[in-house]
Amino acid sequence: MTKGKKTAKYKYYKIEGDKVIRLKKTCPRCGPGVFMAEHLNRYACGKCGYMEWKQPQKKE
């Protein structure tokens, strides 16, 4: 058995008509089905460690 709390993956999808919309970003290394965690300034994959930095928003 795994340690910790299990995730409810059904919360990461939205169904509109006949289409499925993924609400979270998927990892480009691991492929579809592995979602990336959204942090304040980055996206991170918990499986392989891949990380993408968010672009800072410009203030006008």
From Swiss-Prot:
Zn(2+) binds at residues 27, 30, 45, 48. One of its GO terms (cellular component) is ribonucleoprotein complex. Keywords: Metal-binding, Ribonucleoprotein, Ribosomal protein, Zinc, Zinc-finger. Its cofactor is Zn(2+). It comes from the Archaea. GO terms for biological process: translation. InterPro entries: Ribosomal_eS31 (IPR002906), Ribosomal_eS31_arc (IPR022845), Ribosomal_zn-bd (IPR011332). GO terms for molecular function: structural constituent of ribosome; zinc ion binding. A zinc finger (C4-type) spans 27-48. Binds 1 zinc ion per subunit. SUPFAM superfamilies: Zn-binding ribosomal proteins. It holds the Pfam family Ribosomal_S27. Part of the 30S ribosomal subunit. HAMAP family: Ribosomal_eS31 (MF_00777). Belongs to the eukaryotic ribosomal protein eS31 family. This is Small ribosomal subunit protein eS31. It comes from Methanocaldococcus jannaschii (strain ATCC 43067 / DSM 2661 / JAL-1 / JCM 10045 / NBRC 100440) (Methanococcus jannaschii).
